[in-house]
Regions:
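Charge-biased, low-complexity intrinsically disordered regions
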Residues: 174, 179-199
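Feature captures the catalytic cores and cofactor-binding loops of soluble hydro-lyases/lyases
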Residues: 34, 39-172, 193-198
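Short, solvent-exposed coil/turn linker segments
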Residues: 1, 132, 180-181
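Hard-cation-handling environments
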Residues: 1-44, 165-176
């Protein structure tokens, strides 16, 4: 953030059970020493990393609602471009989950408290498994159970999470290029311009 202190208004993706659509909400968040103080705000920090060697772009956003409340989840199965998505309540678990996805050459990971809670390797293009269907199904069930244990309250937490990056689905989604206002078909900044409170 260009502001050293005070508060800023930011765009947040709100997840609701029953849909893979998100709602854009505007929240006030503190800034300290030029950094957005999102931890403890009720929001997760989300990041999308370009993984095809085309500039190594990273997009950042915030997520709230019926998503997980602790730990972090990371995946390379993230519609439609299938870059790497990670979202978490703290940087340490985000780093752990993200690095594990990279180590597996793709997949889904849930982490909490500095430990991997569940994982599903997807080494074929980062979206497919080379293991028997029964084994994949069991791994997927463990990831889903772990996400629910971290507080995800959605009838299909995996599909909900993996479509946070789908810019064809309303209303606010995240890509490696940044936040996408789907209705307006444009990239929008995290900070809502023209709305800032004083220190």
């Amino acid at each position: 953030m260009e502001s050293d202190s005070g508060t800023v208004m930011v765009r947040v993706m709100e997840i609701k059970d029953g849909s893979t659509k998100t709602k854009e909400i505007i929240m006030e968040m503190p800034v300290r020493d030029g950094f957005l103080k999102w931890e403890g705000s009720g929001c997760l920090l989300a990041a999308v990393f370009e993984r095809y060697g085309k500039g190594q772009a990273v997009g950042y956003g915030l997520v709230t609602g019926d998503c997980h409340k602790r730990g972090a989840v990371a995946t390379s199965y993230a519609h439609d471009c299938h870059n790497i998505l990670v979202a978490g309540a703290n940087p340490a678990d985000m780093k752990l989950a993200l690095n594990r996805v990279i180590e597996m050459q793709g997949g889904m990971v849930a982490a909490d408290g500095g430990r991997i809670q569940a994982e599903l390797p997807l080494p074929v293009g980062g979206i497919l498994s080379d293991r028997p269907a029964k084994e994949v199904g069991a791994g997927l069930a463990r990831v889903r159970e772990a996400m629910t244990g971290l507080g995800y309250r959605h009838y299909n937490p995996i599909m909900s999470f993996c479509t946070l990056t789908l810019p064809a689905s309303p209303a606010l989604k995240l890509t490696d290029k940044g936040l996408i206002d789907v209705k307006a078909c444009k990239i929008v900044p995290l900070k809502v311009e023209g709305q800032r409170t004083q220190p």
